[in-house]
């Protein structure tokens, strides 16, 4: 059957595995990451000081031998993991995230509390040296009595093109280089016409997976633009519910899209009305018809709508 995460054909047993979502370090002292190129979906968003954290969502992790380095949770990441009904693994958390980590709907696992086994590698300094394996994470799910399989009525968050041939958008903008606007790590993607993938760069060099030795590459890139609010201490406050605009990049083109996400609850303990939702974000074209995504891996950027002009779509 087809993967719920990539739209590609995979083994039936793997297709109904509950995904594992891992909070990846993305500061230079923690690079290179290990295993992240095998993630089916990667989320990126800012935390304090403009530094970005990545969250890799894995379903087919049979050939993943190392995952890391793992860092602490920020409040909006468990809700991004919940969009894929994933179990979410982190190592520590911000004070604001602590408000949500006991929610059983979010299936969170904190290595700092001993929720899963890990190792501290000697080739990096703390806190940039926490690594683990998929086997450790699955064992943690079993020990916590979290099902390792999705429900039979599970519905994929994204709607994929049924054909392996990419959809052509003649009216879309040509996009060979996509500059994300994340200034701290100067992150951008470059399109390779030969294989139809976007290759990731940051900190002035290709972003390499230590485990494979390969540069990270994806078929699709989605931007979800959200209000750039802040908590009282200046930490980013990103509310993922409501509606807004976004960007879809694939197969050498880019087009502006729309998104919406339902509210399931409101938390008033964080100095604001923090709206949250467990369900997936719905992406649509400008005419409100559902976005059809090309088969393959997807990188999703959570980005402040006020900084939209910093996203650069370049034709070379």
Task: Report the location of each language-model feature.
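A surface/extracellular/periplasmic glyco- and lipid-processing/surface-interacting theme
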Residues: 1-41, 48-316
């Amino acid at each position: 059957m087809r993967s719920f995460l990539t739209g590609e054909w995979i083994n039936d047993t793997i297709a109904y595995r509950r995904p594992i979502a891992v909070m990846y370090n993305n500061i230079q002292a923690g690079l290179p990451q290990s295993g992240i190129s095998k993630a089916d979906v990667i989320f990126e968003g800012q935390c304090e000081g403009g530094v970005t954290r990545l969250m890799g969502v894995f379903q087919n992790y049979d050939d993943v031998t190392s995952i890391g380095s793992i860092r602490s949770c920020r409040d909006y990441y468990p809700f991004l993991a919940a969009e894929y009904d994933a179990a979410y693994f982190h190592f520590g958390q911000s004070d604001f995230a602590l408000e949500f980590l006991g929610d059983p709907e979010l299936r969170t696992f904190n290595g700092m509390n001993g929720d899963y086994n890990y190792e501290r590698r000697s080739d990096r300094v703390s806190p940039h040296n926490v690594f683990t394996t998929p086997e450790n994470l699955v064992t943690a799910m079993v020990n916590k009595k979290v099902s390792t399989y999705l429900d039979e009525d599970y519905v994929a968050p994204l709607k994929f093109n049924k054909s392996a041939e990419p959809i052509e958008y003649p009216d879309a903008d040509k996009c060979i280089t996509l500059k994300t606007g994340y200034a701290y790590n100067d992150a951008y993607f470059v399109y390779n016409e030969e294989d139809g993938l976007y290759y990731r760069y940051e900190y002035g060099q290709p972003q390499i997976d230590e485990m494979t030795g390969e540069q990270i590459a994806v078929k699709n890139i989605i931007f979800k633009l959200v209000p750039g609010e802040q908590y009282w201490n200046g930490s980013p406050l990103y509310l993922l519910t409501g509606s807004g605009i976004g960007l879809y990049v694939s197969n050498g083109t880019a087009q502006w899209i729309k998104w919406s996400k339902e509210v399931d609850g409101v938390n008033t303990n964080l100095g604001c009305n923090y709206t949250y939702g467990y369900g997936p974000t719905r992406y649509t074209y400008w005419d409100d018809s559902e976005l059809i995504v090309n088969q393959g891996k997807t990188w999703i950027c959570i980005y402040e709508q006020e900084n939209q002009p910093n996203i650069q779509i370049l034709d070379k």
